[in-house]
Swiss-Prot record:
Protein species of origin: Drosophila persimilis (Fruit fly)
Gene that encodes it: NAAT1
Glycosylation sites: 201, 204
Entries under SUPFAM superfamilies matching the protein: SNF-like
One of the GO biological process terms: amino acid import across plasma membrane
Domain of life: Eukaryota
UniProt keywords, alphabetically: Amino-acid transport, Glycoprotein, Ion transport, Membrane, Sodium, Sodium transport, Symport, Transmembrane, Transmembrane helix, Transport
Record's compositionally biased regions (Low complexity): 21-42
Protein name: Sodium-dependent nutrient amino acid transporter 1
Length: 652
């Protein structure tokens, strides 16, 4: 039986039959009962008041949405973070827990967030009309998103700085400066005659070899020239560097220009933000695999350390990387999907993005470790582990060091590499920043989108200044650990629990069937209701039990830093109970216990945003409920006659 008019959005309708995940037709719906009619009448009165609401802007076409999801999910996490994470957690063996985590946590969470955004046409806060008491999940995710935005933008500033200086005739990090007495050139050995070093300085460096640890010019350039690193922040973090401040400002100008008109502007930019990095990545891949030593680097990356599979930390890091890479749990996926038409085919998009994300991570890892293999070959270092650095050091020390050793036009490859990183970073921050702007515009309908985008961009720039100080990398490490990773993780657990355990798996699956015209397969049901939440809870508990004080450059943070970090985590995590208590205090229904129970029931605002679609949804839900009631009654009646038959048979 067709569900005519079910998918009406923006004045159009899609009256296709409900088709299962394996192509089977949905069961025929029973006629609407009197109870359903009464419910429909009540809902009609409620949605009539919504008729005057301005309709939500939609993507220009479905491809813009797909490109936007690719631009945020296929980002810095694939090229910068994944290779090092894989290398640290068993190399090729890490791919096994990562792929398992992807299928049991990553894909289910990604698809669920797409569904929630598209079904409600609301951002990460407003979707919680499904379980109003859980609105703090949305606000907590917004807090974590703000934390991530601030330090992500500082990485953009560093990338832009390196991009600008890459246009010089000689890469500035490729040679030693006179004051660096413990320096070794990053340029190829045959180019040393072109270095701006005096013979006395070279002699001094040679004399120091046995007593002082030598450092590459790329490392000293990053630490002493670019970030002017402080090794101790007990006396403060210092003042912002003017060059990095300028780069930070330019980065935020670009971000604002991309998001100023919402999806109308960011959707067009998404084509470039999503596709251009692949062009550069393939160019770098072709160049990288032809370098001497590239094979050793790739083998080092892919060679499995099977013993690591039994290490719980590896599984924890696989989950963290999956969240970081796919951008789930922080709001962008919900936000992007909220601008879709109600009947958009998100199942296909979710599968494309999550698969492409994994393939890109592998591609990025092979490319990067091929380059690092060449670096080890040029330095005559057998263990590639000795040339690999973590964190920002991987992007701004190891990579530049390797690129400076390219024999042919290293400036070109440097420009391509850092421009690719800049584009990847812009794609990620555009999504994160748009999430915050959408939350504010959903809450305050009269606010102009571009004004909110401008105000939040200014705030983002001002907050980002703390990271371009000499002690900025300390703050980045602290905020990422306490304000980003763990806050996102614990709130993602509550997000999943609120939808599938409190709202209910059956209710949620009915909503998906209504919107997508396809039944929810057993795989999704089992993951959402059991595997995904249980695995996340176990891993979070393990992380909390085994947590250790964080370090930067092998140095522990001062006590005040750890206190500030836990305070940051507390602010993010506390959004959940605080907003729950606030909701109960503002919506009292009888006793405290009754108000508590009421906070777990969907509010009148829950459902499709389009009034006509909402009417059809209520009819569909009531028909589904009637079908289940009839089936249950028939089942009981059948059991009764079966027992009666057995009884009569036993007495004859």
């Amino acid at each position: 039986m067709e569900l005519k008019g079910v998918h009406q959005q923006n004045g159009t309708s899609n009256g296709t039959g409900a088709v299962g995940a394996e192509g089977e037709s949905a069961p025929p719906t029973a006629p609407a009962t009197a109870e359903a009619a009464a419910s429909l009448e009540t809902t009609t009165e409620k949605v009539d008041a919504e008729q005057q609401k301005p309709e939500r802007t939609n993507w220009g076409n479905g491809l813009e949405f797909l490109m936007s999801c690719i631009s945020v999910s296929v980002g810095l996490g694939n090229v910068w973070r994944f290779p090092f994470t894989a290398y640290e957690n068993g190399g090729g063996a890490f791919l096994i827990p990562y792929i398992i985590v992807l299928f049991l946590i990553g894909k289910p969470m990604y698809y669920l967030e797409m569904i929630m955004g598209q079904f409600t046409s609301q951002g990460t806060v407003k979707i919680w009309s499904v379980v109003p008491g859980f609105v703090g999940v949305g606000y907590g995710q917004a807090f974590a998103t703000i934390c991530i935005i601030t330090y992500y933008s500082s990485l953009l500033a560093l990338t832009l700085y390196y991009l600008f200086v890459s246009f010089q005739s000689v890469l500035p990090w490729s040679y030693c400066w006179e004051e660096w007495m413990n320096c070794v050139d990053s340029r190829p050995q045959e180019d040393t005659d072109a270095l701006l070093l005096s013979s006395s300085n070279v002699t001094n460096v040679t004399a120091l070899t046995d007593t002082v640890k030598l450092q590459s010019s790329s490392e000293l350039y990053f630490l002493n020239v670019v970030i002017k690193e402080k090794m101790d922040i007990s006396d403060g973090i210092g003042d912002p560097d003017w060059k990095l401040t300028l780069a930070l400002f330019v980065s935020w100008v670009v971000i604002f220009l991309v998001i100023m008109r919402g999806v109308k502007s960011s959707g067009k930019a998404a084509y470039f933000l999503a596709l251009f990095p692949y062009v550069v990545l393939f160019i770098l891949l072709v160049r990288a695999v032809t370098l001497e030593g590239a094979r050793d680097g790739i083998i080092f990356f892919l060679e499995p350390q099977w013993g690591e599979l039994l290490n719980p930390t590896v599984w924890k890091n696989a989950v963290v990387q999956c969240f970081f890479s796919l951008a789930v749990g922080s709001g962008p996926i919900i936000m992007f999907a909220s601008y879709n038409r109600f009947d958009h085919g998100i199942y296909r998009d979710a599968m494309i993005v999550t698969t492409l994300d994994t393939l890109t991570s592998l591609l990025g890892g092979i490319t990067i470790f091929a380059i690092l293999g060449n670096l080890a070959h040029n330095l005559q270092i057998e263990n590639i582990r000795d040339v690999v650095r973590s964190g920002t050091g991987l992007a701004f020390i190891s990579y530049p060091d390797a690129i400076s050793k390219f024999q042919a036009v290293p400036q070109l490859f440097s420009v391509l590499f850092f421009f690719m990183l800049f584009v990847l970073g812009i794609g990620s921050i555009v999504a994160l920043q748009s999430t915050i702007v959408t939350i504010l515009c959903d809450q305050f309908k009269s606010w102009k989108y571009w004004k909110v985008a401008l105000a939040t961009s200014i705030c983002g720039f001002l907050m980002g200044l703390v990271y371009v100080t000499p002690g900025g990398q300390w703050i980045l490490t602290l905020v990422d650990f306490y304000g980003g990773t763990y806050v996102v993780f614990i709130l993602a657990i509550f997000e999943l629990a609120g939808i599938v355990w409190i709202y209910g798996m059956q209710n949620f699956c009915d909503d998906v069937e209504f919107m997508c015209n396809r039944r929810v397969s057993l795989y999704w049901r089992v993951c959402w209701s059991f595997f995904t939440p249980v695995m996340m809870i176990v891993i979070f508990i393990y992380s909390m039990v085994t947590i250790e004080p964080i370090t930067y450059s092998e140095q522990f943070f001062p006590e005040a830093g750890n206190v500030a970090g836990w305070l940051l985590f507390g602010i993010g995590a506390a959004q959940f109970p605080l907003w729950w208590m606030w909701y109960i205090s503002q919506h009292r229904e009888g006793s405290l216990g009754q108000s508590f129970v009421a906070s777990l029931r969907p509010s009148d605002k829950w459902g499709p945003a389009n009034p006509e679609t909402k009417r059809q949804w209520v009819i569909f839900k009531n028909e589904k409920a009637a079908q289940r009631a009839t089936k249950k009654q028939s089942s009981k009646l059948g059991a009764f006659w079966q027992k009666l038959g057995h009884f009569c048979g036993s007495n004859t």
